[in-house]
A protein has these predicted regions:
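Flexible loop/turn segments at secondary-structure boundaries
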Residues: 5-6, 38-39, 92-97, 138-141, ...
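Alpha-helical scaffold segments that mediate packing/assembly in large oligomeric complexes
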Residues: 1-75, 103, 108, 201-205
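Sequence/fold signature of self-assembling virion shell proteins
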Residues: 9-22, 63, 102-205
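Residues immediately flanking
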Residues: 1, 90, 185-187
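A beta-strand-loop signature enriched in Asp, Gly, Thr, and Trp
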Residues: 51-131
Length: 205
């Protein structure tokens, strides 16, 4: 309690910022792999949706190939391509950074397909589409039938509903006998796939 009152550092604001960061981390995971409200009180994540999203299987076990990425992109209807992007684990991203074009000739022959961003805050590109990462997503090599990469127009395919803005209440009285101050943080959000045709999922064979 004394630290909150006497410190030159605004510890109260530090606590608030810590809660907000914790909310962001939890939501990032839940919108990707959340298991639903019925049992777990979580949103249904993009990679957990049990029906509706068309899946594209890797051609074979082992390394992801250029053909796998082409199949994933070509499987998405053209009306969603303009705003499409990739979403994957960082380890999968690292593997894709090593992909080169194949074939005997052509502009992509033996050229890296990955386009690193040269502007701070802008995403890297793969085959002309932005790439975003989320470490909650299964990574390539985690096992058969694992969903390892999503591609599509996420704004149209997945809806996030903010049911209640974050509220953080300082509890001055509850722990007063112990010389402590408590904080109660509450935030209610949900999310789910609303337009599965706008999304495609790459899965392990």
């Amino acid at each position: 309690m004394d630290e909150l009152a006497d410190s030159d550092v605004n510890l109260g604001q530090y606590v608030v910022n810590a809660f907000l960061q914790a909310f962001m981390n939890a939501e990032e995971a839940a919108f990707a792999v959340g298991r639903g409200h019925t049992t777990y009180q979580e949103p249904v994540g993009i990679f957990s949706a049990s029906a509706g999203i068309t899946t594209v299987a890797l051609d074979a076990a082992g390394a992801i190939t250029f053909d796998d990425i082409k199949d994933l992109i070509s499987g998405l209807p053209s009306q969603y391509l303009q705003s499409a992007s990739f979403l994957m684990h960082r380890a999968t991203k690292l593997e894709l950074q090593k992909l080169r074009g194949v074939g005997a000739a052509g502009p992509l022959y033996d050229q890296y397909l990955w386009q690193p961003s040269l502007i701070a805050g802008q995403p890297d590109m793969l085959c002309g589409y932005p790439v975003y990462t989320n470490d909650s997503i299964p990574q390539h090599g985690d096992g058969a039938l694992q969903k390892i990469c999503a591609f599509g127009d996420f704004r149209r395919g997945y809806e996030i509903i903010d049911r209640e803005g974050a509220s953080i209440t300082r509890l001055n009285e509850l722990y007063i006998t112990a010389g402590l101050i408590g904080f109660l943080a509450v935030r209610r959000v949900t999310g789910g796939v609303v337009w599965p045709d706008a999304l495609r999922i790459l899965v392990e064979p």
